[in-house]
Curated annotation (Swiss-Prot):
Family: Belongs to the elongation factor P family.
Name under which the protein is recorded: Elongation factor P-like protein
SUPFAM superfamilies attached to this UniProt entry: Nucleic acid-binding proteins, Translation proteins SH3-like domain
Pfam families per record: EFP (PF01132), EFP_N (PF08207), Elong-fact-P_C (PF09285)
One GO CC term, this protein: cytoplasm
Family annotation (NCBIfam families): PRK00529.1, PRK04542.1, yeiP
GO biological process: peptide biosynthetic process
Taxonomic superkingdom: Bacteria
Amino acid sequence: MPKASEIKKGFAIESNGKTLLVKDIEVTTPGGRGGAKIYKMRCTDLNTGARVDERYKSDDVVETVEMNKRAVVYSYADGDEHIFMDNEDYSQYTFKHNEVEDELLFINEDTQGIHLILINGSAVGIELPSSVELVIEETDPSIKGASASARTKPARFASGLVIQVPEYIATGDRVIINTTERKYMSRA
């Protein structure tokens, strides 16, 4: 069984008799020498859908749950539900908006590399690729000669995602975004 420091976003863990899907991990180091890092994991209870926070020290052993991944593409939205289609057998998987709302910020019809997470044969979540390519919907006008400065400005995408981009980026530019850190990487 892995230690808490080896757990990543998207892992399924077992805690207090509950099966949890790790949505986000926050690492803090308490003051003082030799203080072990504390991993605060924001999870979703796969049975109830409730959000659960778990805390572990870096050397705590965490019980993981075996899971399978299948390549899928975003198909369409139907009211409050979002449908993903399996790339191999074309079966469809439906998620409520609140179950995948964080992931939807990085997804459009062209997004490749999305994986469906299956535990005991049932779909429990989706995993994003490490980076995605999106088109900027709205940002302040670009400033000529600003490429040498490290100043940034907010940029909004069609999905509602807002991140900081360099000043020389303009509306309509295709950019590559790191999905785990929610940061601009480069122009596409």
